[in-house]
C-alpha cells in the first residue's frame, strides 16, 4: 500500500492527512521499533526491528547504544510522530527506573528531531489493538498481524509491541489533535 504525503484542512485548520509513525517499545536490553504509514484508519507496516544492547555493558553505554540505534531508524525512515508507551508501575523498582531512563533518552531524541510525541498507556494500546485492555501478549501480536495484513506474526515480540503502539496512534491521533486545538483556543 502506497500513501502520498499531502496536507488538507480539518474544521478549517490545516491538518496532516498522511502520517509516518515510529512506534517504540522501550527496553534497556531489547528495544522494539516499528514504522507504519497511513491515513486515518488505513495503514500499513513499512518496517520493524529491534535495537539490542548488551546487558553486560555499563548502563550509560546501553543508553548511548539505544540513542544511536533509534537515531539511525529516524534518519532512515523520517517519521512524523513517535508513539511510545507511557511509564507504568513495575513490580521491580530497579527495572522501572531503568525504563524511565530509556524513555527519557527516547523523548529527548524525538524532541531534538522536532518529532511529535504521543504517549499511550499499555492498557489503552491493548484496548485499541485487541479490544480488551487486559489482553495477553500473544493476542496483541496476532491482532497486529491481522490489522497490518501481514503473513505472519511480527517477531520478536518487542517489534510487534512497537507496531501496536503505532497502530494505537492512528486510532487516537485525530482525537488528540482536536483536544490540543481546543485547549489552545481557551484564553
Q: What spans do the regions from the language model cover?
A:
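Phosphate- and other anionic-substrate recognition elements at nucleic-acid/protein interfaces
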Residues: 1-187
Amino acid at each position: 500500500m502506497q500513501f502520498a504525503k499531502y496536507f488538507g484542512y480539518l474544521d478549517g485548520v490545516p491538518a496532516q492527512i498522511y502520517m509516518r509513525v515510529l512506534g517504540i517499545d522501550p527496553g534497556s536490553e531489547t528495544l522494539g521499533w516499528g514504522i507504519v504509514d497511513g491515513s486515518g484508519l488505513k495503514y500499513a507496516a513499512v518496517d520493524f526491528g529491534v535495537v539490542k544492547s548488551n546487558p553486560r555493558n555499563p548502563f550509560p553505554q546501553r543508553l548511548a547504544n539505544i540513542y544511536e540505534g533509534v537515531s539511525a531508524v529516524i534518519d532512515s525512515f523520517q517519521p512524523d510522530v513517535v508513539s511510545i508507551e507511557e511509564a507504568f508501575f513495575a513490580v521491580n523498582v530497579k527495572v522501572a527506573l531503568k525504563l524511565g531512563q530509556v524513555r527519557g533518552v527516547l523523548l529527548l531524541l524525538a524532541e531534538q528531531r522536532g518529532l511529535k510525541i504521543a504517549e499511550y498507556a499499555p492498557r489503552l494500546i491493548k484496548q485499541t489493538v485487541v479490544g480488551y485492555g487486559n489482553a495477553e501478549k500473544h493476542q496483541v501480536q496476532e491482532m497486529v498481524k491481522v490489522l497490518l495484513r501481514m503473513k505472519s506474526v511480527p517477531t520478536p515480540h518487542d517489534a510487534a509491541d512497537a507496531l501496536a503502539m503505532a497502530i494505537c496512534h492512528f486510532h487516537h491521533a485525530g482525537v488528540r489533535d482536536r483536544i490540543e486545538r481546543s485547549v489552545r483556543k481557551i484564553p
